[in-house]
Structure formats: C-alpha cells, structure tokens
Amino acid sequence: MSDAQKFQLGTIGALSLSVVSSVSIVICNKALISTLGFTFATTLTSWHLLVTFCSLHVALWMKFFEHKPFDPRAVLGFGVLNGISIGLLNLSLGFNSVGFYQMTKLAIIPCTVVLETIFFRKMFSRKIQFSLVILLLGVGIATVTDLQLNMLGSVLSLLAVITTCVAQIMTNTIQKKYKVSSTQLLYQSCPYQAITLFVTGPFLDGLLTNQNVFAFKYTSQVVFFIVLSCLISVSVNFSTFLVIGKTSPVTYQVLGHLKTCLVLAFGYLLLKDAFSWRNILGILVAVIGMVLYSYYCTLETQQKATETSTQLPQMDENEKDPLVSAENGSGLISDNGVQKQDPVWNSNKDFQA
C-alpha cells in the first residue's frame, strides 16, 4: 500500500470516527439535558476535556504516543482560545433564538474561507465555493426558522464565529508548523481548555439557566449519562483534531453539517421528532452540496498530484522531493509550479492578546 493510499485510508477513518462519535454524544447529551434536566453545558464540556486529558495521560504512560513539547505560549494561547470559543458558542445559544444560533454556525464556513484567503493566501476554486453555497443553503433550509435579533446576542455570535474560525485554523496550522500529531497537540492543550471552562463554566451556566450546577440533584441516572458523555467525548475531541489536521478547517465544518443532518434524521426516525417537507428538502440539498464538495476536492487533489509528478523529472537533484520540502516548512509548490513560502502563525505575535 502506497503512502497516498495510507493517508486516504487514515482520512476516511478519521472522518468516520468523527461522525459516529459526534452523533453518539449528541444522542447522549440530548437524554442528559432534555430528559434528565442537566442543562449545564459549559461545565459538562470542562469535564469532557478533563477526562480526555486523563485518558491521553494514560495512553502516554502506556507509550501509545510520544510527548513532544513545543512553544508553551502557542499551547497556552491555543488552549485558552478554544475554551473561550466554546463558552461564546454556548452564550450565543443562550442569548439568541435557535434559528439565529443556526445562522451563526452556518457563518463559520464563509468566515473561515475569508480568513484563510486573506492571511494564508489559500485559493478556493469556483467549484468549491459553489458546492459550499449549495451545502449552506440546504442546512439553512433544514434548520433555520425564526431570526429574532438582539444586540447582545448578535455581538456574542460574532465573537463566537471569529474565535471558532481562528481556533480551527490554528489547529491545522500548529500541527504543520511544529510537526506535532493531533494527539500531541490535544494532550498539551487540553489542560488549558479544561481550566478555562472549569473556572467560567459554573458562572456561564448559572447565567443561562438560573441554576447552580453544584446544587443539582445527581441521581444514578444522571451520573451514568455524565460518565458516558465524558467517555464518548474522548473520541470526539481526538477525532476533531485528527480531521482538521488531516484535511482542513473548512472540511471539518462541512463534516459538522453532515452530522447535523444525521441528527435531524435520527430524531425523526427514532425519536419521532416533528419533521416537515422543508426539513427533508433542506437535508437533500445539503447532501448534494456535500457530495459536490467531496467530488471537487478529490478532483483537485488528483490534478495537483498529477501536476507535481510531471514536474518532478524537470527539477534539479536538490529539488526532487517538494513534498518533503513543504513538510519541512521550506516552501510549497503552487499551481503554476513556482515555489512559494508557506505562511505560518507567528507565535510571538498571534498568541498575544
């Protein structure tokens, strides 16, 4: 099996793990929040991250992966930013209607595209842009209902979108810049994410629910679903970093909308949730957008691989392996065969707020 085939197989595995684990945790949390009344989402997320860190620490002790320290300021900034983005998304849901919150989630893809284009000079073809528009249109039809606006909610949503986009772009960029795996990055950033949410979680949850997480009555059922949710979250967090590292932040967001469609379909088929022809139409349009996005991405990847292979014989002996050169951070081959620098985050500048 060639390296390219191994990479494709690993990517498919990461995408599959992300879908299965994310849908599973949504089902578990739906039972915990809707049925059992445990509405403390931010605090629950901090517990997820603590369990994830403990699990990775055990895996490190068993030598399943190697600890690779790198720029501590980069880790701190990245971890805190991730924690803030999660808190802002929860606040956005609390201070906005469900419809406006769904619009907030839809805005993440175009915002990511704009940021990557401006700061990383990454080009998205017309075909890719077209498929993303179809996808967002479908998800919008299926999920967006009322659009009640208020100033505080709008500001929180804007901040949530920006921090989420930057955090996901950094997830991809840091792995490439410091040559760390998704597991190594998750292990080092998890404590900072967990501490950020553990400190702010009870306050945010109290603000949104008017309840105290520590005064909640923890029955055996509640404890069971909390433990189950935390265990599933290990797979969710791991697959998130894995997918973004192997693909891109935009692809991860496309995958996120696939999960939304699957959750809607699950709710209708098994839980008998209310479903309309609008939901069905939206899901079908979204699926068409996802298929087009996957097809165009695969097509462009194959075209670039073909162009690179035809250029290799024409290069000097010192330039025979551009992929290794790119991996070492020395440059990338652009579409016209000219070598260009790969822009990276400047830890001294980009992690100081």
Curated annotation (Swiss-Prot):
Cleavable signal peptide: none
Membrane-spanning ranges: 7-27, 31-51, 75-95, 100-120, 132-152, 154-174, 194-214, 224-244, 250-270, 280-300
Stretches for region Disordered: 308-353
Residue numbers of Phosphoserine PTMs: S334
Membrane topology: Multi-pass membrane protein
Main localization, broad class: Golgi
Keywords, alphabetical: Antiport, Golgi apparatus, Membrane, Phosphoprotein, Sugar transport, Transmembrane, Transmembrane helix, Transport
Cysteine pairings via disulfide bonds: none
Pfam families (UniProt xref): TPT
Gene Ontology biological process: UDP-xylose transmembrane transport
Name of this protein: UDP-xylose transporter 2
Organism this protein belongs to: Arabidopsis thaliana (Mouse-ear cress)
